[in-house]
């Protein structure tokens, strides 16, 4: 007889998922460098994004998990301590430095891809010459911004000039590293000057990286499909994650579970064998209200967010204004273990004002006195973090209460 799969009810699944994403409790104490590193290590990475409508994604993601977060700490970990490195997961991210060896496979894949004429031609008619010139410049001058080179536009990626495209080529293939960001501009240097030798020279096999990526992702998600494991770091393919799961199930390294969604339907997923202990140890989500970045890792997979929380969320930044349902920069509102609404916001830094352009509550959610006070407190806290001395939210709050 086939053994029945362990079942996880929706409330328990939410609690574990939010615990893994550091969203069950929120520290109000000032975070230390060690605290911040531990948080990023727990998450796996923190995504970088340049959009500054309210706050840049990396800062907002970390602030959502601790109001004592300070922006300069992230710079300290990345630039001063070299505890983090910047490269790609599903997007540009800051990643714990100890994970660096596994990115050699990404470097090799980028090197093979960039040899193709469709890619190399973006550097110009003589890509080898441009790359050699850029490499020589950095070897001689050290830390370099793209604007140190005079050739601009006229092709390349996103209108970049040949030298900027060559910089990206050398970074994507691991020859260069990003030392820090000035504003949001990348500062490049040779990897030999940035990455510790032991990590830079390590070469884990593909098999080891597949095992590491899948296990590390599963530990940070609590439960997942093989597709979700592959997507976590975007280091391995879906086929590789599936093959790993099949083998790991046979060995007993992982088990299959059934996870109940918000709609009551259950979906099969993978979990570590100690899942019952993990569920028991997960913190109960605190009922505090908080805003999340549109790029928060907890909502990155929209289908999973809908399945687990019943929250249908889409980033509308790239949607033409007239076709947007909500707004340009809409932040999900979380209360305990559920999403209760969303708010379109903009920080007007010229006049120190945080504007709530629109507020929409989920079906069945009422803006009673207690929730209104919690919302106003969360807005005041976010306003303080963004440097706003005034919160302009009166009209949306009145409409939401009506």
Task: List each language-model region with its residue ranges.
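Long, charged, low-complexity, helical-prone intrinsically disordered regions
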Residues: 1-402
């Amino acid at each position: 007889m086939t053994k029945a799969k362990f079942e996880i009810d929706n409330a328990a699944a939410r609690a574990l998922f939010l615990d893994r994403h550091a969203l069950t409790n929120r520290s109000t104490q000032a975070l230390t460098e060690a605290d911040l590193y531990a948080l990023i290590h727990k998450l796996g990475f923190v995504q970088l994004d340049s959009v500054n409508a309210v706050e840049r994604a990396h800062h907002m993601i970390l602030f959502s998990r601790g109001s004592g977060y300070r922006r300069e700490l992230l710079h300290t970990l990345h630039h001063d301590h070299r505890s983090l490195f910047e490269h790609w997961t599903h997007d540009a991210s800051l990643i714990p430095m100890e994970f660096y060896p596994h990115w050699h496979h990404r470097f090799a894949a980028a090197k093979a891809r960039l040899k193709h004429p469709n890619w190399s031609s973006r550097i110009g008619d003589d890509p080898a010459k441009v790359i050699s010139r850029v490499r020589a410049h950095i070897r001689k001058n050290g830390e370099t911004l793209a604007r140190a080179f005079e050739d601009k536009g006229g092709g390349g990626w996103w209108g970049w000039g040949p030298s900027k495209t060559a910089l990206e080529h050398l970074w994507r293939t691991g020859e260069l590293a990003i030392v820090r960001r000035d504003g949001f501009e990348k500062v490049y240097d040779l990897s030999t000057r940035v990455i510790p030798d032991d990590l830079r020279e390590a070469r884990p096999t593909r098999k080891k990286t597949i095992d590491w990526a899948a296990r590390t992702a599963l530990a940070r998600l609590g439960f997942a499909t093989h597709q979700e494991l592959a997507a976590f770091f975007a280091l391995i393919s879906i086929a590789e994650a599936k093959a790993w799961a099949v083998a790991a199930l046979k060995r007993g390294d992982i088990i299959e579970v059934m996870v109940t969604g918000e709609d009551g339907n259950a979906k099969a997923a993978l979990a570590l064998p100690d899942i019952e202990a993990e569920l028991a140890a997960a913190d109960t989500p605190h009922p505090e209200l908080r805003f999340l970045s549109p790029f928060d890792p907890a909502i990155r997979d929209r289908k999973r967010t809908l399945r687990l929380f019943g929250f249908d969320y889409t980033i509308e930044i790239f949607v033409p204004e007239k076709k947007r349902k909500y707004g340009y920069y809409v932040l999900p509102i979380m209360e305990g273990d559920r999403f209760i609404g969303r708010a379109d916001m903009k920080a007007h830094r010229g006049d120190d004002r945080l504007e709530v352009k629109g507020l929409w509550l989920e079906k069945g959610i009422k803006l009673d006195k207690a929730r209104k006070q919690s919302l106003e407190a969360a807005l005041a806290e976010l306003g303080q973090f963004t440097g706003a001395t005034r919160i302009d939210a009166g009209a949306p709050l009145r409409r939401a209460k009506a």
